[in-house]
Regions:
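Charged, alpha-helix-enriched surfaces in structured cytosolic catalytic cores
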Residues: 31, 35, 68, 72, ...
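Short aromatic/hydrophobic contact patches that present stacked aromatics
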Residues: 98-102
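A glycine-rich, hydrophobic loop/mini-helix early in the fold
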Residues: 56-97
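An acidic, glycine-/histidine-flanked metal-binding catalytic module
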Residues: 1-37, 41-51, 162-226
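Long beta-strand-rich cores associated with HINT superfamily self-processing modules
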Residues: 90, 103-213
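Generic alpha-helical secondary structure
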Residues: 29, 33, 37, 70, ...
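Short secondary-structure junctions
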Residues: 50-51, 82, 120-125
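Generic solvent-exposed, charged/amphipathic alpha-helical segments
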Residues: 37, 41, 45, 74, ...
């Protein structure tokens, strides 16, 4: 239903009441996803604080969160062949709520993943390791879909959240690559294949730097706790 169609509806008509009911359900669901993000973020901040006290460093550089935009949710459901309903959003989409965890070193990524997995109220739905198995464009990150219970006034609801865990270098590359590659019409421009190769080369350079920093950390760790 378009905005113009909504404006033409009388507020007491069946169509307008149905629209308002669906909108209310959608915004309530987005609130629930925001709450799920806060639950995950709190877990991560607790782990980071504990590690800071015990090891005098923070494995997590920073955390970013996001809720998928309504247009993106709609488009994804359409591609999957489902109607835009709150029931279908909860059933078929795992990445409406997203948390990006950026770490200092590669081994911090797997440590954070293990610590989250070990928590008894966290259910791991799916793992995709794009660090050991990078995408063809050079993208590297560790993805997890987790389900956690969120407590509301009417009871407990299991909510799914996508976690993306990566190093500072991986995040730097992924952010800039997204800005460069998704400019409108870039795929039709001359030299696009060369640009793709250059981006892939830069991704390889960054993982080499990440691996080198990990080796240096491991050497220091033989004599000093890190």
């Amino acid at each position: 239903m378009t905005k113009d169609e909504v404006k033409k509806l009388r507020m007491n008509s069946p169509e307008s009441l149905q629209f308002l009911n669906n909108a209310t359900k959608f915004y309530n669901l987005m609130m629930m996803y925001r709450c799920a993000i806060r639950e995950i973020q709190t877990k991560l901040e607790v782990l980071d604080d504990e590690f800071s006290v015990e090891n005098n460093r923070n494995p997590i550089s920073f955390i970013k969160t996001r809720i998928k935009q309504p247009n993106s949710i709609y488009d994804k459901l359409q591609k999957m062949g489902y109607e835009f309903t709150t029931e279908n959003i909860q059933t078929y989409l795992n990445d409406v709520a997203g948390v990006r965890i950026v770490c200092a070193f590669i081994d911090d990524i797997y440590m954070i993943s293990d610590l989250i997995t070990q928590q008894d109220d966290v259910k791991v739905i799916e793992i995709k390791d794009y660090i050991k198995n990078p995408k063809s464009n050079g993208y590297r990150s560790y993805h997890m879909i987790v389900e956690i219970p969120v407590f509301f006034a009417k009871g407990k609801t299991p909510m799914r959240v996508e976690l993306q865990i990566r190093t500072n270098g991986m995040d730097f590359w992924a952010t800039l690559e997204h800005q460069l590659r998704y400019k409108k019409g870039i795929e039709e421009m001359p030299g696009y294949d060369e640009i793709s190769e250059e981006l892939l080369h830069s991704a390889r350079a960054i993982i080499e730097a990440d691996n080198e920093m990990q080796r240096i950390k491991d050497k220091i760790g033989m004599f000093h706790e890190i």
